[in-house]
Structure formats: structure tokens, C-alpha cells
Regions:
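Short beta-strand edge/turn micro-motifs at domain boundaries
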Residues: 92-94, 115-147
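Acidic/histidine-enriched, glycine/proline-rich intrinsically disordered or flexible terminal extensions
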Residues: 140-171
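Short beta-strand segments enriched in hydrophobic/aromatic residues
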Residues: 30, 42, 99-101, 133-136
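Extracellular/periplasmic carbohydrate-active domains that bind, remodel
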Residues: 6, 48, 71, 98-108, ...
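A solvent-exposed, acidic/Ser-Thr-rich amphipathic alpha-helical stretch
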Residues: 35-105
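Short, surface-exposed coil-to-beta transition loops
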Residues: 78-80, 110-117
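Short, low-complexity N-terminal intrinsically disordered segments enriched in polar/charged residues
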Residues: 1-32, 36, 40
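Short aromatic-glycine motifs in intrinsically disordered, low-complexity regions
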Residues: 108-109, 121
């Protein structure tokens, strides 16, 4: 590991805090249906995927994708729990953000856990998301949360056939 100066270490801490703030801004904007603020969280050439399937590209494409998905949603709460970040070249970072979701989807209360696998870039004076892949650990009907979590197919989005977790248990 390369030794860092005090100034570099301080900058790293400030960058980590800025990326944490970015993720909270994204969650609050999404929950508040503020697609302008959602778009500002991303780089101009960003991509957003779900389990590896690209849903939106570019700021406006991502905002449109999320707005379209939210047409079938009621109240939502995204709650981040942790962020683990690695810094590469100047202005580049990658990370994993763990979160729980409470969503009303198609009139059904759902609960689950996800991880966002992200790439970040410093652009326009701020850290922004350059790539985000939402990977689902489990999600299902709130009333059946324990049953869904213990299932071999714990990814149970309403209206979609149950799937295995993006993070299956290793045996």
C-alpha cells in the first residue's frame, strides 16, 4: 500500500463522505419522485442496470427508466446501511452500497435487501454515479417476508416468477 500524505488522507475521507451523501441524495430523490435530482446523481454517460440488465443510459435515460418503474409504485423507502468504497485513479471509485427496500408495488407491500454495485466518477465538481447495478438479495410480499427470505428463490418481485438471489449462499 502506498503511503498517503495527511492532505491525501483528508481528501480520501472527504471523498468517502461525498459519495455517502450522493447515495443518500439518490435514495431521497427516488423516494420523493424528484427525477431532476435523480438525474443529477449520475454522470452524463452513466448506466443503470438491475441484475446486469441495462434499464437506462445517460442522465435522462436513467431518470425516465426510474420514473417509468415508479408508475406502478406507491410509497417507497430506500434505507442505506453501508457503503464500501475503493478508490482508483484520480476522480474514480467503485463501491458496494447495501440497503433495504420497503415498497408498495402494484398495490402490494414488499420488503427486501439489495446491493448496488457502483462505479463513481468526479464530474462537474461533484462525485456522481457512472454505473449502478442493483442486485437483489431477496424481496417479496411483506406478510411473507420470513418465508421468502428462507426460500431457494428469494427474489419474488410481484408479477414476476420467483428467481434465485443474486447472492446465493455458498455451500
Amino acid at each position: 500500500m502506498v503511503a498517503m500524505s495527511i492532505e491525501e488522507r483528508l481528501q480520501r475521507l472527504e471523498d468517502r463522505a461525498a459519495i455517502d451523501d450522493l447515495n443518500v441524495r439518490y435514495f431521497l430523490a427516488a423516494d420523493g419522485d424528484d427525477m431532476t435530482a435523480v438525474a443529477e446523481c449520475f454522470t452524463s454517460d452513466a448506466s443503470f442496470s438491475s441484475s446486469g440488465h441495462v434499464g437506462g443510459q445517460g442522465r435522462q435515460g436513467i431518470a425516465d427508466f426510474i420514473a417509468d418503474a415508479r408508475k406502478n409504485m406507491g410509497l417507497t423507502i430506500h434505507t442505506p446501511h453501508y457503503g464500501l468504497y475503493e478508490f482508483g485513479d484520480a476522480g474514480q471509485a467503485s463501491g458496494i452500497v447495501g440497503a433495504h427496500l420497503e415498497l408498495v408495488l402494484a398495490g402490494q407491500a414488499t420488503y427486501g435487501a439489495i446491493r448496488y454495485v457502483d462505479c463513481y466518477r468526479f464530474e462537474g465538481g461533484d462525485w456522481r454515479i457512472a454505473a449502478r447495478d442493483m442486485r437483489t438479495i431477496y424481496i417479496g410480499e411483506w406478510a411473507k417476508c420470513a418465508e421468502v427470505f428462507a426460500s431457494a428463490t428469494p427474489v419474488q418481485w410481484p408479477g414476476i416468477a420467483p428467481l434465485p438471489s443474486d447472492y446465493p449462499r455458498r455451500s
